Each structure stands twice: as structure tokens, then as C-alpha cells.
Amino acid sequence: MEFSQKLYQAAKPIINDIYEDDFIQKMLLGNIQADALRHYLQADAAYLKEFTNLYALLIPKMNSMNDVKFLVEQIEFMVEGEVLAHDILAQIVGESYEEIINTKFWPPSGDHYIKHMYFQAHSRENAIYTIAAMAPCPYIYAELAKRSQSDHKLNREKDTAKWFDFYSTEMDDIINVFEALMNKLAESMSDKELEQVKQVFLESCIHERRFFNMAMTLEQWEFGGKVND
């Protein structure tokens, strides 16, 4: 079994939990609250900006020009392509995506997730650690979306179904590249090192779950007390 497949197998319980959590279940039914979607979009805009920067940090770690070219293309996709999925949710909220994200928001769950990825990028020379931290994002979105396609609860009469349709196909290219890179880099690593990479991957899976849940709880920073002067 290739290393990437071992990671996916280990992540299955977490992905199952994400699928059964309120965010995805309400998205399937099409009855998710507008406030939750607004919260998600504002947080995701901040997250994706940093995720794009992480692609740029990966480029110097690449040995192949083809890999560099693909990462540059992914930066373009993050800036332009994924806006289609965001527009779907913004229309449900009843506001333009630009209006929604004009309110800057950096929730605890997004903060911790991004710092986890930046730590790998800055503290590890081997690119596999950064890739392992980033890879769960597209992989989990794709897995959730593909599972939804055969779920009788997916309400085709609601616009949220279009969000699942988008992610059921649009993540495939980056998933395949991340898989190939991780599998290639894993070949020269010890079992102990691969366990560390696995830990990084699974931690990002947990961060993904917390990110979705953040939207449902309208997560804010809590510094103690009702008023902080």
C-alpha cells in the first residue's frame, strides 16, 4: 500500500465524523443557517489567503519544474477558481461574496490550523511535512462531496447541492499531485519519520473538523469575562 493510501485509511474515522457533524448534514439537507455560512465564508477567505502563501513556500522545496508549474497553477486556482464554490454559498446568504468577506475575520480554529501548516513549512526542510499538512484540505472536501453524491439526504432542490457538486470533481488534480509527491518523498524516509508525517496529516484532519464546527458555533475569540477593556 502506498504511503498516501495509508494516510487516507488512518483519516477515515475523522472524515466520517466530519460528514456526520452539523455543518455537512445541514448542507446536505439545504437548511443550514445564513449566519453559519457567512461565518464560514469570512473565515475561509482568511484561511485561503494563507493557504495560497503556503503554495509559494513549497515552490523552493520542489526539485521538478513540472511540480513548480503545477503549484503556480494551483495558486491561480486558489485566487480565482474556488470563488465559484464561495459564490454558491454567498447567493444562499443573499449577499455578494465580496460584501461578505469585506468583514475580516480570523477565528481561533482557522488561526490554529494555519499556524500548524506554517510550522511545517518553516521548521522542516523536507517538503513532505508541508504537503502532509496541506493535503487534508482538498482531500477531505473531495471525499465529503463524493460521498454526498450517493446520499439520499442530498437535497437537489437546494443550491447547497451545487457546492457538493463542485468539490466532487475540482479537487482531483491537486490531490493526485500531492499523493505523487508524498509517495515519492516517503521512499527515502525511515518508519519513525513517516510516523511523524502521519501525525502531521491527521492533525490537519482534526483542524478541518474544527473549522467546519467553527462555522456552526459562530466561534469567536474568548478572553475571559463579557467585557475586555
UniProtKB/Swiss-Prot annotation:
Keywords: Hydrolase, Thiamine biosynthesis. One of its GO terms (cellular component) is cytosol. The active site is at residues 137, 208. It holds the Pfam family TENA_THI-4. It is an enzyme of class 3 (hydrolase). One of its GO terms (molecular function) is thiaminase activity. Catalyzes an amino-pyrimidine hydrolysis reaction at the C5' of the pyrimidine moiety of thiamine compounds, a reaction that is part of a thiamine salvage pathway. Thus, catalyzes the conversion of 4-amino-5-aminomethyl-2-methylpyrimidine to 4-amino-5-hydroxymethyl-2-methylpyrimidine (HMP). Is also able to catalyze the hydrolytic cleavage of thiamine; however, this thiaminase activity may not be physiologically relevant. Therefore, is probably involved in the regeneration of the thiamine pyrimidine from thiamine degraded products present in the environment, rather than in thiamine degradation. This is Aminopyrimidine aminohydrolase. The lineage of its organism: Bacteria, Bacillati, Bacillota, Bacilli, Bacillales. The gene is tenA.
